[in-house]
Amino acid sequence: MVSENEKTRRPKRSIQHRQNKDENNIEIKAVAKFLRASPRKVRSVANTIRGKSVSEAFQVLEMSPKKAARLIEKVLRSAVANAENNANLSSDSLYISRCFVDDGPRYKRIWPRGRGRADIIQRRMCHVTVAVKSIEAKS
């Protein structure tokens, strides 16, 4: 028996197209979920590339020594591939319209301490979303 709530629910998708009235104003995004990195550390890298062109963002990410830069670079490559294959856009004409990091679940570990006590260590996860648009739509 299917409940009323399950009938109306839409399936989750990692690739979405948002179109306004203008055909050039299309936004393509890619999402990576459950990444084993602290959202706070990943956000600092995401803030550096927001609003930049794709080629400039790749240069910034390749020069960064942080683990978060590798994770965001992978999501950005996926978003660019989505734009090229699904929307027939050139990678030269893309910029990062949105880039944000959400908190994911945490898993907890016990760290033994002195005198029979224990501390709980929280290992954090995050969800990274990168959306790209055509530069022609920006102006």
Swiss-Prot record:
<dbReference type="InterPro" id="IPR001063">
    <property type="entry name" value="Ribosomal_uL22"/>
</dbReference>
<comment type="subunit">
    <text>Part of the 50S ribosomal subunit.</text>
</comment>
<dbReference type="GO" id="GO:0022625">
    <property type="term" value="C:cytosolic large ribosomal subunit"/>
</dbReference>
<dbReference type="GO" id="GO:0006412">
    <property type="term" value="P:translation"/>
</dbReference>
<comment type="similarity">
    <text>Belongs to the universal ribosomal protein uL22 family.</text>
</comment>
<keyword id="KW-0689">Ribosomal protein</keyword>
<comment type="function">
    <text>The globular domain of the protein is located near the polypeptide exit tunnel on the outside of the subunit, while an extended beta-hairpin is found that lines the wall of the exit tunnel in the center of the 70S ribosome.</text>
</comment>
<keyword id="KW-0699">rRNA-binding</keyword>
<dbReference type="InterPro" id="IPR047867">
    <property type="entry name" value="Ribosomal_uL22_bac/org-type"/>
</dbReference>
<protein>
    <recommendedName>
        <fullName>Large ribosomal subunit protein uL22</fullName>
    </recommendedName>
</protein>
<dbReference type="InterPro" id="IPR036394">
    <property type="entry name" value="Ribosomal_uL22_sf"/>
</dbReference>
<feature type="region of interest" description="Disordered">
    <location>
        <begin position="1"/>
        <end position="22"/>
    </location>
</feature>
<feature type="compositionally biased region" description="Basic residues">
    <location>
        <begin position="9"/>
        <end position="18"/>
    </location>
</feature>
<dbReference type="Pfam" id="PF00237">
    <property type="entry name" value="Ribosomal_L22"/>
</dbReference>
<comment type="function">
    <text>This protein binds specifically to 23S rRNA; its binding is stimulated by other ribosomal proteins, e.g. L4, L17, and L20. It is important during the early stages of 50S assembly. It makes multiple contacts with different domains of the 23S rRNA in the assembled 50S subunit and ribosome.</text>
</comment>
<keyword id="KW-0687">Ribonucleoprotein</keyword>
<dbReference type="GO" id="GO:0003735">
    <property type="term" value="F:structural constituent of ribosome"/>
</dbReference>
<dbReference type="InterPro" id="IPR005727">
    <property type="entry name" value="Ribosomal_uL22_bac/chlpt-type"/>
</dbReference>
<keyword id="KW-0694">RNA-binding</keyword>
<dbReference type="GO" id="GO:0019843">
    <property type="term" value="F:rRNA binding"/>
</dbReference>
<dbReference type="InterPro" id="IPR018260">
    <property type="entry name" value="Ribosomal_uL22_CS"/>
</dbReference>
